UniProtKB/Swiss-Prot annotation:
Positions annotated as zinc finger (unnamed): 3-34
Molecular functions per Gene Ontology: ATP binding; DNA binding; zinc ion binding
Tagged with keyword Transcription: yes
Organism: Gluconacetobacter diazotrophicus (strain ATCC 49037 / DSM 5601 / CCUG 37298 / CIP 103539 / LMG 7603 / PAl5)
Keyword Nucleotide-binding: yes
Gene label: nrdR
Example GO BP: negative regulation of DNA-templated transcription
Residue span, ATP-cone domain: 49-139
Record's protein name: Transcriptional repressor NrdR
Keywords, ordered alphabetically: ATP-binding, DNA-binding, Metal-binding, Nucleotide-binding, Repressor, Transcription, Transcription regulation, Zinc, Zinc-finger
Function as written in the Swiss-Prot or TrEMBL entry: Negatively regulates transcription of bacterial ribonucleotide reductase nrd genes and operons by binding to NrdR-boxes.
Bias type Basic and acidic residues, positions: 7-21
Pfam families listed in its UniProt record: ATP-cone, Zn_ribbon_NrdR
Length: 178
């Protein structure tokens, strides 16, 4: 494997361990030329997957892009990095197990939304707002209506403590609650 620091092709594996519940192998390597140490992670790839975009373009599936999207949706939420990796691994396994090599992007989005809905409802709404390209507040209202316990004013648009804090910051009038 090529050294990411100097580009030399001769690196040695110093340590290998199971990673991500055995779904991958973590290897510590050292470069023979510059002596820098680095880590690689190897995963099994059952088949090459392709994403079919809305305009019918076919692009290679990128696990890192999926992971980045999930991380963005879960940013500042109470979900640790290890759980995010398990979520992404599970999503990739489901895609590979589907038996399809060409997967529509909308199907990947639905799969991610279904998983995020079970993990964190805020992350689900964040992801859905990008996936479905929300343009107006009514788009958010519609998705909130689909969530049990949020219909017909059961839950304020801004939860109580947050609404009070925002009202205190915004001065007279504050934030109107639904």
């Amino acid at each position: 494997m090529r050294c990411p620091f100097c580009g030399h092709e001769d690196t040695q594996v110093k340590d290998s361990r199971p990673h991500e519940d055995g779904a991958a192998i973590r290897r510590r390597r050292i470069c023979a030329a510059c002596s820098q140490r680095f880590t690689t992670i190897e995963r099994v790839q059952l088949r090459d997957l392709y994403v079919v975009k809305a305009d019918d373009r076919r692009v290679p599936f990128e696990r890192d892009k999926l992971a980045r999207s999930v991380r963005i949706a879960l940013r500042k939420r109470p979900v640790d990095e290890e759980r995010i990796e398990r979520i992404v691994n599970g999503l990739v396994r489901q895609l590979e197990a589907s038996g399809e090599t060409d997967i529509p992007s909308r199907d990947i989005g639905k799969l991610v939304m279904g998983t995020l809905r079970e993990v964190d409802i805020v992350a689900y709404i964040r992801f859905a707002s990008v996936h479905w390209d929300f343009r107006e507040t009514k788009d958010f209202a519609a998705i909130l209506q689909s969530i049990p316990g949020t219909a017909d004013g059961d839950v304020p648009v801004v939860p109580g403590d947050a609404a009070a804090a925002i009202a205190a910051e915004s001065g007279p009038g504050g934030v109107k609650r639904r």
